[in-house]
Amino acid sequence: MPIRTRHRSSPVTARALLLLAVAALVALVAGCGSPDYTYVTNSTDRTYLKVPTTWRQIDGKAMDDAIGFDPTLTEEERGLWFEAYDADSAPSPVHLFGPSAPAPAAFVGVQQIPETARGQFSLDRLRDLFYPVSPSARQAAELDPTSGVSDFVLVSDEVLTPGKGLHGVHSVFRYRVGDGPMQMMDQTAYLNDDASKLYMFFVRCSTECYEQRQREIGNVVSSFTVRETT
């Protein structure tokens, strides 16, 4: 009867296989790399946005100072949650509110609306949240030498009705802010069914920047999501 001989892997072979497995795992993890996006989440108000990891958050205190908030008030007392991001190497509120954003800068927020003010938010009011966009607001800005904006060009304007009571407006337009170069603004605003919450988002940068980074900006814009409960 033939004798079957069992061959054991030598210690060297076993160790080599183990090293290969570890190397493959390391390569797999390295291939995954760091996340491409930062996920901005407001779970309470079910509001979501994703921005490239190269867009860094603007300091909250700097934002408070730029907007003029009382720093002693809590988010709940303000009735406002917001975050701001900037793709510039030196993130600053100036890139959101100043004459020029050389790289994309974005703002996302949710405002609680007092019951006494809930009837005041028309679609045009949503259009004019950050800049004068509606015809009446533009006319007023043109007549006001202190408005700080000029050379308006409307690129697109779309009424949004995603369902579950949400309704809003998505507007894309160009403006010159102060003496700066032309800026491209892309903004979206929603109201919930009883107008108790205002969801807002905008991103801006110079027209040259926008042309160069349109796909990147478009991915951020399309990621802005509100999941209002029924």
Describe the residue ranges of each PLM region.
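Conserved polar/disulfide-associated segments of primarily extracytoplasmic proteins
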Residues: K61-D193, L198
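Bacterial N-terminal signal peptides that target proteins for export
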Residues: P2-L19
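Short aromatic-glycine motifs in intrinsically disordered, low-complexity regions
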Residues: Y37-K50, A137-D144, Q214
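C-terminal motif of bacterial Sec signal peptides marking the signal peptidase cleavage site
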Residues: L28-G31
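Soluble non-cytosolic domains of exported or imported proteins
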Residues: R46, Q120, D124, T207, ...
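Surface-exposed amphipathic alpha-helical segments
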Residues: W55, A195-T230
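Bacterial signal peptide processing site
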Residues: G33-P35
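Proline-anchored loop/turn motifs at beta-strand termini and strand-loop-strand connectors
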Residues: T44-A66
